[in-house]
From Swiss-Prot:
Pfam families the UniProt entry points to: OsmC (PF02566)
NCBIfam families: organ_hyd_perox
UniProt xrefs under InterPro entries: KH_dom-like_a/b (IPR015946), OHR (IPR019953), OsmC/Ohr_fam (IPR003718), OsmC/Ohrsf (IPR036102)
Protein name, per record: Organic hydroperoxide resistance protein-like
Sequence similarity: Belongs to the OsmC/Ohr family.
Lineage: Bacteria, Bacillati, Mycoplasmatota, Mycoplasmoidales, Mycoplasmoidaceae
Naturally occurring in which organism (per UniProt): Mycoplasma pneumoniae (strain ATCC 29342 / M129 / Subtype 1)
Length: 140
């Protein structure tokens, strides 16, 4: 397996600190507040959801290209990330939703399933921490 990209991030002060990558990305962190819809700082769950959504969206694009499908509207990927506390041990669970138009249900299901198999983030999540796939609002 050949490395095609590598970066390193450094963090200090935990969830109340700062994360910086060696290539210039910097973000201030804050612990997520239950019920808060907007904070001036981000949390690791938001960053994970954003990265996973971007990665899965790229996997969808690749699958569409492989099947020679051109859509009038770009599919939208949503990733939900939940932070769970089980006896003081935190767990992250994640699920993926795809909104796609311009193809039939069978093709859409093929796209989301193939993208899930291809996406590095999907392969990273253990089955017990995966909340599942949702296609156009329907859980698969």
């Amino acid at each position: 397996m050949a490395v095609i990209y590598k970066t390193t991030a450094h963090a200090s002060a935990g969830r109340e600190g700062v994360v910086q990558t060696v290539d210039g990305f910097t973000v201030s962190l804050a612990f997520p507040k239950p019920g808060a819809t907007h904070q001036d700082k981000n949390n690791p769950e938001q960053l994970f959801a954003s990265a996973y959504a971007g990665c899965f969206s790229q996997a969808v694009r690749v699958v569409l290209q492989q099947h020679q499908l051109q859509l009038a509207t770009q599919p939208i990927v949503g990733v939900s990330v939940e932070l769970h506390d089980q006896d003081g041990l935190f767990h992250i669970k994640a699920g993926v939703e795809l909104a796609i138009t311009g193809v039939d249900q069978t093709t859409a299901q093929t796209v989301i399933t193939a993208a899930h198999a291809m996406c590095p983030f999907s392969r990273l999540i253990k089955p017990e921490n995966f909340l599942g796939l949702t296609l156009n609002g329907a859980k698969l």
